[in-house]
A protein has these predicted regions:
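Electropositive polyanion-binding surfaces
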Residues: 42, 194, 199-201, 217, ...
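Acidic, low-complexity intrinsically disordered tails
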Residues: 1-17, 673-682, 717-743
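Charge-lined substrate channels and their catalytic hotspots, especially those that engage the 3′ end
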Residues: 1-297, 304-350, 382, 681-684, ...
Length: 743
């Protein structure tokens, strides 16, 4: 651009200044656009000759100041340094591209692999917006790595003659990581290791790592389970000082302690748990008060009697947040001395509890309720199967008590659903393992009345404790809130609900509800309709994904899924830290103590919610690993399944018998060239016109089982399709969709 000298430029008037502001705002609103002089003059209200002259002068000043540059003849754009800049966290995909999560921005910023500047997953980066799409979303270029993530990577070492490369398990690390063989001479080929990124110099093909830990040879069950824990930065042992602190706890129950508690040792009390349970943190007692009136005690292990606030053990429990349940093991929140011994409500032993006691009639009216510390004696340990047998036959130990509890529990359950609770009955996958941890079979744990019996009384205790702690009556009779730890669940967003509505429409189901309890009512109706159908699992899974996530907070919004205005977690303090927090709050408020520090509670709630999510991800990873390990023995075999998902590159199929899911790449399907018709959400064969969509029954062959990536590849067999091809002479009707890159 030919510059004008400053002395020949006219003075800036108010009108000129306004036009300059409009022009600058245009550049900033559309940072990737190239604007002509004519366009800018017209857009700023200066289509006349005089207006174009003023626009040219403004562009001259912006050019001199380094804000815009001439990129073609009389075409202008923002200079790189004046493009919108953001700082955020890099979220890497399997392809090597990155999405940058920026606080306060609705959408992530997409960064193509060629513009990532060696950034890695979890890095804090500076990104400049170089393009803005029609949907308003930015595409960016990473200009600086503000801070490298210290998150470790787990992978398999490939040892060469002069170097070691670690192939990471995580799909978020698509590059191999270099280790110095000279620095780490003992690392073996095929060994599972934990590494951190130390450096990634510009121009280098691979990041340089530092060895954190050697886990053992890949494929060994203990190694692989420890690898999952390491991937999610979860501990698998306690430090010696914590074990020593646990061993030092005095477990004796003195006469003085018993005298300070309500004594339930003469009241029939028992536990009901899974057959493989080692810690028993809840028990039920039942006593007939008079005809049609029962006293039900919900007795919870008094963990906070043994674990003092801010002690070594308490600090570790805060750090862990929750117990973690992998397929073949439990990683406890508390040391075994507490979780399996002192706090566990074992049969034929006296135990200390924190209890919620209710006097109920057959109409479920709560005639009395009492909260406080107790001492109990567990008369019997039932498994769920044993309690279920009593329910079904009417015979067995404590049959009258169990039948009474079950009758009341089923009535509570009916009342809950009548009030708008959602019936999410999901199957829980289990594995039959040999002594080495190898999966021999897959089965599903069914929720029966014995499970529901325990669940309903735990829900009753949780909601009543939440309301008692969260509110109090003033001297003038007003109800006021006080700081409390809640387990809350919001109603689904309109956007997620609309996606769910469109999803189930493909199966012929219509969902009209848009807000309030009508959503829950219609969901329950839908679940009843799809029971036993091919689409049941796909629809139920999508329904769960459409819901908001439950979390811990001090700001009560109620629990939408359970239809409770007040709800908390009180009943599992051995395995959840928020329950320990609630026990301490209950003790405080029973003693008329002053209100707790809400800000401190909120910080602990936030951390507990984070730890819960991480634990759930690790649990799912262990299930996926065992599913792939199980199917590795069935390579080449054929199975029946149903289509559970579609993408432009493949078909997800869930096997009917085991509910194991894998993907069949479209390119792997022999006999035709298949394309994804996004508009109609189906796959169509170009030659045959065969169509495949969600819920279709298919036959597959197991092609590959990648244990390291926990990934299954299937091959859909065309002769196993149960959807007919078009009649002869009827050509395939292929709707060509705009194929998008996998972002």
């Amino acid at each position: 651009m030919k510059k004008q000298s400053q002395k020949n430029r006219p003075a800036r008037g108010a009108k000129n200044t306004d036009r300059a502001a409009v022009i600058l705002s245009l550049f900033r609103e559309f940072p990737n656009n190239k604007f002509s002089l004519k366009h800018l003059a017209s857009a700023s209200g200066g289509a006349t000759k005089e207006g174009r002259r003023e626009t040219f002068e403004i562009l001259g000043r912006l050019h001199d100041e380094g804000i815009v540059e001439e990129c073609a003849r009389e075409k202008y754009r923002l200079t790189h340094k004046h493009l919108p800049h953001f700082e955020g966290i890099a979220d890497m995909t399997a392809s090597g591209s990155i999405y940058v999560r920026v606080e306060g921005e609705e959408n992530d910023i997409f960064v193509n692999q060629r513009n990532t500047a060696n950034a890695l997953n979890g890095d804090r980066v500076e990104v400049v917006a170089i393009h803005r799409g029609r949907d308003g979303k930015f595409e960016g270029e990473i200009t600086r790595i503000v801070e490298r993530s210290r998150k470790p990577y787990v992978g398999v070492a490939e040892v060469g003659a002069h170097q070691i490369f670690v192939r990471a398990d995580s799909r978020r690390m698509p590059m191999d990581i270099y280790l110095s063989k000279k620095q780490y001479p003992d690392v073996k080929d095929g060994e599972k290791v934990v590494v951190r990124i130390a450096d990634w110099a510009e121009g280098s093909k691979s990041p340089v790592g530092e060895l954190v830990e050697r886990l053992g040879m890949a494929g060994n069950n203990d190694t692989e389970m420890h690898a999952i824990l390491a991937e999610y930065e979860l501990p698998y042992r306690f430090d010696p000082e914590i074990e020593q602190a646990a061993e030092a706890i005095d477990g004796s129950i003195t006469a003085k302690e018993i005298a300070a508690r309500r004594d339930f040792r003469q009241v029939t009390t028992f536990t009901v748990d899974p057959a493989d349970a080692k810690d028993f943190d809840d028990a039920l007692s039942v006593r007939r008060v008079r005809d049609g009136v029962w006293e039900i005690g919900v007795h919870i292990a008094d963990v906070t009697h043994y674990v003092r606030p801010q002690s070594t053990i308490d600090d570790e429990a805060v750090e862990r947040g929750t117990s973690v349940y992998l397929v073949d093991r439990t990683v406890p929140m508390l040391p075994e001395r507490l979780s399996n011994e002192l706090c566990s409500l074992r049969p034929h032993e006296t135990s200390l509890c924190f209890s919620a006691v209710f006097t109920l009639n057959e109409n479920l009216d709560i005639l009395e309720e009492w909260f406080g510390r107790t001492v109990i004696y567990s008369d019997r340990r039932f498994t769920y199967a044993e309690a279920q047998e009593v329910i079904e036959t009417g015979r067995g130990d404590y049959a009258e008590e169990i039948l009474t509890l079950n009758r009341l529990a089923q009535a509570l359950r009916r009342q809950r659903f009548k009030n708008g609770a959602i019936s999410f009955d999901r199957e829980e996958v289990k594995f039959k393992l040999d002594e080495t941890g190898k999966p021999l079979g897959v089965y599903f744990k069914e929720q029966k009345e014995s499970n529901q019996m325990i669940e309903e009384f735990m829900l009753l205790a949780n909601r009543r404790v939440a309301e008692f702690c969260g509110t109090r009556k003033t001297d003038k009779g007003r109800t006021v809130e006080r700081p409390m730890v809640y387990r809350v669940h919001d109603s689904p967003s309109e956007e997620k609900l609309d996606r769910f509505r469109q999803f189930i429409l493909r199966f012929g189901h219509i969902f009209k509800a848009t807000k309030g309890r009508a959503i829950a009512k219609e969901l329950n109706k839908l679940f009843a309709q799809i029971k036993g159908t091919t689409e049941e699992n796909a629809v139920a899974t999508m329904a769960v994904r459409s819901m908001a996530k439950a979390y811990y907070t001090t700001d009560n919004i109620g629990h939408y899924g359970l239809a409770f205005p007040y709800y908390t977690h009180f009943t599992s303090p051995i395995r959840r830290y928020p329950d320990m927090m609630v026990h301490r709050l209950l003790a405080r408020y029973l003693a008329d103590g002053k209100a707790a520090d809400k800000a401190m509670l909120e910080d602990l709630c936030f951390r507990a919610s984070e730890r819960e999510v991480i634990a759930a991800e690790a649990e799912r990873a262990s299930i996926k690993y065992k599913m792939v390990e199980f199917m590795k023995e069935h390579i080449g075999e054929e199975f029946e399944g149903h289509i559970s998902g579609l993408t432009e590159w493949g078909i997800y199929v869930e096997l009917d018998e085991t509910h194991i899911e894998g993907m069949s790449f479209l390119r792997d399907i022999d006999g035709d060239f298949f394309q994804f018709d996004e508009a109609n959400y189906q796959i169509i064969g170009r030659s045959t016109g065969r169509r495949m969509t969600l819920g279709d029954a298919v036959r597959i062959r197991v092609k590959r089982a990648d244990l390291q990536k926990r990934q299954l590849d299937f091959e859909v067999l065309l002769d196993g399709l149960r959807t007919p091809a078009p009649a002869e002479g009827q050509g395939p009707q292929v709707r060509r969709s705009n194929r998008r890159k996998n972002r």
